[in-house]
Curated annotation (Swiss-Prot):
Residues 1-64 are annotated as: Disordered. The lineage of its organism: Bacteria, Thermotogati, Deinococcota, Deinococci, Deinococcales. 2-[(2R,5Z)-2-carboxy-4-methylthiazol-5(2H)-ylidene]ethyl phosphate binds at T205, P206, T207, G236. This is Thiamine-phosphate synthase. It is an enzyme of class 2 (transferase). GO terms for biological process: thiamine biosynthetic process; thiamine diphosphate biosynthetic process. The gene is thiE. Its cofactor is Mg(2+). It comes from Deinococcus radiodurans (strain ATCC 13939 / DSM 20539 / JCM 16871 / CCUG 27074 / LMG 4051 / NBRC 15346 / NCIMB 9279 / VKM B-1422 / R1).
Amino acid sequence: MGWSGSPLTLPPLRGSPPLPQVERDRTQPQLLAFADAFPSEGRGELRSRERRGEATGRGGLRMTAPTRPLGHLYLVATPRPGQSEAEFLRRVEDALAGGVDTLQLRCKADSGQYGEARPYIALAERLRDLAHARNVPFFVNDRVDVALAAGADGVHLGQNDLPVEWARLMAPGLRVGRSTHRPEDAARALAEAPAYFATGPVHATPTKPGRVAAGLGYVRHIAALRPTLPWYAIGGIDLGNVQAVLDAGATRIAVVRAVLDADDCAAAAHALREALMVNG
């Protein structure tokens, strides 16, 4: 059963310019998916969650209190084409065992089956369980609806995603992270005061094709600001170049391929964690 009510909208933010069309186009499908992901026949499961003592937000959707500490080695877990879900989950679990202490699930609209809300939510719930078993905070990329439905700790938003304030209005129980790519992005992030922000890409990476690398100079710029918010250097970071990133002033890093595509995910995570601890 799909959503059959009137169009879903959010109110304009006081003192804010109108939302650009690209962001309006991205927001409406999220709101529709949010309404469609839990039709009336699914309410019994939501009531079961409540009986189990799981906190819920408005509408019965579970929301997680921000109690799990942000770590220093952040894995952005992205399912690989042709990779089975079991293999993906095994690699993520190994990475957590090796020392990953903050986890994000990133599935974009073109990510095969995970482009749809229900499979995305189901996968997010599996990763949430793996993360929470180790008291690791779990974030969902881009999708506030999926983060809420899956009981994630938070949502990570890019520059073309929802404004942080809108995400807070939709889901006051979620922590919100933000991507930044240049000094003006960082200035906005500091004003928005998200739970954390990411800086990069430090190096060119196939994870973000076509995006010009921000370079180590951007890392130095952020470090010189001495922000009180946690921040992560991200983009093409691996064991071979992590020391230069740390020397530029970063104390936290986010990675994808360096861990998830390694022959031994646990060993790769452990080596990066050791580098962070030595420089901590």
